[in-house]
């Protein structure tokens, strides 16, 4: 079975992509901070015949992200397709003239370190 992982899986884009790929025969790894959210999404997808498994990770804590991707590959098989689409926190969105270097740590972890770690792991 071909496997895809959705990092930042949620009820919008993540659910639509999971449903589309899942109905084409892909195994789907749903990865998000909230285990409850991905569990609910997997149950919904199962009703559509999609094989989805859930993993909890915070993209700003790289060991949790790589552990989730490792578990997904062990459970569903090698990950061949990756979608990275978590929603940024609202406090990341500051006016440029009010943004200092320390304000960029979270957004950089989220927008650069997370996707790079995910791509390298897959």
Where are these regions (language model features)?
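Conserved alpha-helical elements of the SDR catalytic core
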Residues: 17, 72, 121-122
């Amino acid at each position: 079975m071909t496997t895809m992982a959705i990092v930042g899986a949620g009820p919008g884009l993540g659910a639509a992509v999971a449903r589309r790929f899942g109905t084409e025969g892909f195994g789907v790894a749903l990865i998000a901070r909230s285990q409850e959210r991905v569990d609910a999404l997997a149950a919904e997808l199962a009703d559509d015949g999609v094989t989805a498994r859930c993993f909890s990770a915070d993209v700003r804590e790289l060991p949790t992200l790589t552990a989730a991707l490792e578990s997904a590959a062990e459970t569903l098989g090698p990950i061949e397709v990756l979608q990275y689409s978590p929603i940024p926190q609202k406090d990341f969105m500051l006016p440029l003239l009010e943004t200092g270097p320390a304000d960029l740590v979270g957004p950089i972890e989220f927008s650069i370190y997370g996707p790079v770690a995910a791509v390298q792991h897959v």
